[in-house]
């Protein structure tokens, strides 16, 4: 599974973290 973190430091594997959040890193 792929963990993505937003620019605010919140991490998750859903599209909310991986796609809809700007400035996220995989």
Swiss-Prot record:
Molecular function GO terms recorded: chitin binding
Database matches in InterPro entries: Chitin-bd_1, Endochitinase-like_sf
Practical use: Has potential use as a flocculating agent in water treatment processes.
Expression (tissue specificity): Seeds (at protein level).
UniProt entry keywords in alphabetical sequence: Antimicrobial, Chitin-binding, Disulfide bond, Fungicide
Primary role: Chitin-binding protein which functions in defense against chitin-containing fungal pathogens.
Gene Ontology biological process terms from the UniProt entry: defense response to fungus; killing of cells of another organism
Lineage of the species this protein comes from: Eukaryota, Viridiplantae, Streptophyta, Embryophyta, Tracheophyta
Pfam family, one: Chitin_bind_1
Classification via SUPFAM superfamilies: Plant lectins/antimicrobial peptides
Name of protein: Morintide mO4
Ranges for domain Chitin-binding type-1: 1-26
Domain of life: Eukaryota
Disulphide bridges, residue numbers: 4-18
